[in-house]
């Protein structure tokens, strides 16, 4: 008896009394990736029916005039993604600039879209550059209103990372004035929020299908994180918030699987105001987020979400390096870690990404160089420790955007190499033309690579007067 791992296929073709036997043997093996067994699904292939118009031959008693054969092959399904150790490196370097409006003289399909709130998310095989467009291009006649955060024309769009977000290159995913996206290893999940301020709606798209919604719970600008959501083992976690920009705004997390919400997570702890979180995996067990408090403090609310228990807790970062803008002088806030201090009204989304190593963990952050304006962007790092209790200053690691250039929202993401993940930080560099002209953004990207010092800052190269 043949072993079960060997399949023998015998195909008999009879034509003119000639017998042909073809033997095909195939062996199956189990593949291991990150200690996770790959899953296989049976896929049937049926050979087509073929008519055999053969002449009668005297020494052939019977001729099969048709032949069919059903064969079953086992094909591997794409695997869910899990966080891995970071690729080796000790410093970030300038990786890429996407400055669409350097091509502002182009017209028609080659014209750059007017965008804001860019972010990047990566799957196993590609990264996508997302943004929220005003459904307008530059040059064009629809500049009025492109400085507004919310309107009926805004859409979540994407291009392959490295492409310029032009009319022709961009994929329009859904109507949205707030957005997120992530890849679970098998498919993309897209998140878009739009609707009136008092009754906004979260919409979820999985691949090409619109799959689920989530309604406003505080009736005050339901919104999401403006950066990538985070997936592990097929479950994707999305931060949302709903509430006043200058008062209470309590966040939640949605657990999403294949485009459908399967659980709501209600954080505990310091929950007064949490929005625009930038999140990533500290380990296979914990998602951490550095967020924005637009009402009470210049310290960042810091979330720890346990993906095994689906519980989350929020406390303020204790470091004397305050990461929001505007902010007071570093170290000037007295009292316990939960003290708000002054200059807490207003804020900005901040960059944050993990460097996972075998023996320690690095947490990289970005903040504007100006304490009062959205100008410049500097990189900081802290190895090990607990952001909730460590009061020491973060270590400065280089200037990504000088004080002469705009530094607005920033975000973190990870590029998947073959055996490790590359941590990166992206920076939104806004061309702020005021209310009378176009208002759009470039994106600067810095990634962990090599050693030494961060060498060079980024400029957009755009003159709005041209």
Curated annotation (Swiss-Prot):
Sites carrying sugar chains:
56, 64, 144, 284
Membrane topology per the entry is: Single-pass type II membrane protein
Task: Give the enzyme's main class according to its UniProt record, as a single word.
Answer: hydrolase
Q: Which HAMAP family match?
A: INFV_NRAM
InterPro entries assigned to the protein according to its UniProt record, in alphabetical order: Glyco_hydro_34 (IPR001860), Sialidase_Influenza_A/B (IPR033654), Sialidase_sf (IPR036278)
The UniProt entry's GO CC annotations, sorted and at most eight, read:
host cell plasma membrane; membrane; virion membrane
> Which residues are recorded as binding substrate?
116, 150, 275-276, 292, 374
- What is catalyzed by this enzyme? Hydrolysis of alpha-(2->3)-, alpha-(2->6)-, alpha-(2->8)- glycosidic linkages of terminal sialic acid residues in oligosaccharides, glycoproteins, glycolipids, colominic acid and synthetic substrates
State what protein this is by name: Neuraminidase
Keyword Membrane among UniProt keywords: yes
Q: Which family does it belong to?
A: Belongs to the glycosyl hydrolase 34 family.
State its location(s). Virion membrane; Host apical cell membrane
Q: Which GO terms describe its biological process?
A: carbohydrate metabolic process; viral budding from plasma membrane
Q: Where are the transmembrane segments?
A: 12-34
Could you state a single Gene Ontology molecular function term? exo-alpha-sialidase activity
Output the SUPFAM superfamilies linked to this UniProt entry: Sialidases (SSF50939)
Q: How is its activity regulated?
A: Inhibited by the neuraminidase inhibitors zanamivir (Relenza) and oseltamivir (Tamiflu). These drugs interfere with the release of progeny virus from infected cells and are effective against all influenza strains. Resistance to neuraminidase inhibitors is quite rare.
> Which residues are listed for Ca(2+) binding in this entry?
293, 324
Q: What else is known?
A: The influenza B genome consist of 8 RNA segments. Genetic variation of hemagglutinin and/or neuraminidase genes results in the emergence of new influenza strains. The mechanism of variation can be the result of point mutations or the result of genetic reassortment between segments of two different strains.
* Organism of derivation: Influenza B virus (strain B/Singapore/222/1979)
Residue ranges that the UniProt entry lists as topological domain Intravirion: 1-11
Region annotated Head of neuraminidase, chain positions: 89-466
